Structures are given as C-alpha cells and as structure tokens.
C-alpha cells in the first residue's frame, strides 16, 4: 500500500508534560485506521497536529503531494442558528467552492441529511444529526484524508449504525482514507482495517483487523500445581504456549484428554482447565498495562 501520511517521532509538550511522545506511524491510502485510547491518552492532541490546527514541539509530518484534508475534531464547529444547507453554504464561501449548490446537495445526501427541513436550525438537531452535519462540512471539499475525532461517542445504536455506514461509504465509494478515534475498542470493530493503540501520549501497539481476530480466538487456559515443570513438559513435547498472568494459554485445538494424561504422567496436578475467548475490553486492558510498564522505563 502507498503511504498517504506519516509521522516521525512526533511530540507535543507543555512544560514538562508530554502530551504526545515520539509518535511514528504511517497511514496508507484507502485504509480506515482506528486510533484507540482512554480519555487523556493524547488522541485529540495527535489529531490536531495531523490536521494542522496546532504545531508539534518536535518531529515531522509528511503527506503525499496535493493531499487534501478534512477534519472533525472534538465538538462540531456548526453555526447553531443556520440550517444544514446554510451551514454548508457558509463553509462553501470560506472554501471559495465553485458550483457550490450542486456540491452541497450531493454532500447532504452522502450523510443522510437531504430530507431535513431546510428551515430547521442546527441547534435543534439531535446529536447524531449534528455529527453527520459536521462530517458533511469536513468532506465538502472532497478530501483525500479525513480525520474523525470520536464521531460515534454518545450516539444511540441506530446512530452508531448510521455513522458506520457513512464512514464505510466514504472509503468504499469516494476513496477517502480515514483516521477515526475512539476510547472504546469495540466501537470501531465494524469499520476499521487497522488499530493504533495510544496510552499516555505513546503508541503502544498497532495491529490489523485480521491480527486482532486471531488474537481474540478461543484459547485453552491451564493452571497446575507446578508452573515451571509444566512449561518444561510442554516444551519437551513441542506444545506451543503463552503465559497469561497465572495461566498457561494454549491453542483451542489442543486435545484436552491427551494433555491431562501427559501432565499426570509427569506427576503434575491440573488445578484448572477451561476454554475462553478474550474480549475486546480484556485485550485493550492488557495493552494498557503493557503501556504502563513501558511508561515506567521512560
């Protein structure tokens, strides 16, 4: 995939506080990336730097030639006393767009606001309608790269479904590359190709949707009365495993009865054995814990 935008050791510091610390990442053309982190992780600060709203303390941002950018950062910047169509007309004037009326009607249709009462002021819109109007403002100039800061946050299930549909359509039908942030991993499950996990200003993990699905596959968990001897026995018999806190994690395809017989033959007592699939939330918390451990080394 060709790179659309990349950063190298991008940092933002206020006094001694490192809001964003040495972030190096690449956004590829045509993908939807999910930037995930708890409140205060530095997501919005990073997005504000990428969109050019604030400057970095150090590091570089490189984008492909003639890359146009649109952004919805934090609260939608709407004109509360204007209707949806007049909000877009106001933005079109700022952008000096030609054939603006035709483009405005097309954009309203993209976000599902084409049938809204033209006299209804945006201050009277529902949250979902305001978010969709904000996206309309961000895409009015046909950006190549679209930044969306928590556009799903606070929406009801219907609003979430509508927003996901809009985001996928912008990529699939209009070729936009999208970076979307959230503090909830599962919110992005249906739309993103790749996840970027952020914690305390750092990127702690990046993985594709396929890699996440593999990580969350059902696993066999084992606990015995002799942890070191169990690991040695598994290694001697070529059985792959991972350490997961107090448990030993094995493939769900492992033959349980054969495993138990093997351990009994080596005088190892099985205290607990069960199959379980890791949740999005559990995996996310594991990554945050890894981030905490990394942070102590800085």
What do these predicted regions represent?
Residues 146-150:
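Catalytic Walker B motif of ABC-type/P-loop ATPase nucleotide-binding domains
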Residues 219-290:
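Short, charged/small-residue-rich alpha-helical element at the C-terminal edge
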Residues 51:
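Helix-to-loop junction immediately C-terminal to a conserved catalytic motif
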Residues 36-38:
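The feature captures the beta-strand-to-loop junction immediately N-terminal to the Walker
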Residues 89, 101-117:
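Conserved ABC ATPase "signature" region
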